[in-house]
Amino acid sequence: MAVKERVGVVVSDKMDKTVVVAIENRSPHPKYGKIVVKTQKFKAHDAENQAKQGDRVRIRETRPLSKTKRWEVAEILTDS
């Protein structure tokens, strides 16, 4: 099974070793064709607390680390 990876923006870094990453999905409306932007938020494990709010990061799926945390920060793409 392939490892799932996604790219998003850190919207919160207030928790210890955890960041909240927002990922935008753009798709056309099935009937009207207008581009609709849907945002999903994922909690991701950041072991060294390196990611800051506004950073663009790549996250990868991992085993469940807590009740809501199933992703980890793979790399920081751009700094805020």
Swiss-Prot record:
One BP term from GO: translation
Biological function: One of the primary rRNA binding proteins, it binds specifically to the 5'-end of 16S ribosomal RNA.
The UniProt record lists the keyword Ribosomal protein: yes
Organism of derivation: Microcystis aeruginosa (strain NIES-843 / IAM M-2473)
Family indicated by similarity: Belongs to the universal ribosomal protein uS17 family.
Disulphide linkage map: none
Protein name: Small ribosomal subunit protein uS17
Source species, domain of life: Bacteria
Gene transcribed to yield this protein: rpsQ
Coiled coil: none
SUPFAM superfamilies associated with the record: Nucleic acid-binding proteins
NCBIfam families the UniProt entry points to: PRK05610.1 (NF004123), uS17_bact (TIGR03635)
PANTHER family to which the protein is assigned, alphabetical: 40S RIBOSOMAL PROTEIN S11 FAMILY MEMBER (PTHR10744), SMALL RIBOSOMAL SUBUNIT PROTEIN US17M (PTHR10744:SF1)
A Pfam family assignment: Ribosomal_S17
An MF annotation (GO) of this entry: structural constituent of ribosome
Keywords recorded for this protein, A-Z: Ribonucleoprotein, Ribosomal protein, RNA-binding, rRNA-binding
InterPro entries: NA-bd_OB-fold, Ribosomal_uS17, Ribosomal_uS17_bact/chlr, Ribosomal_uS17_CS
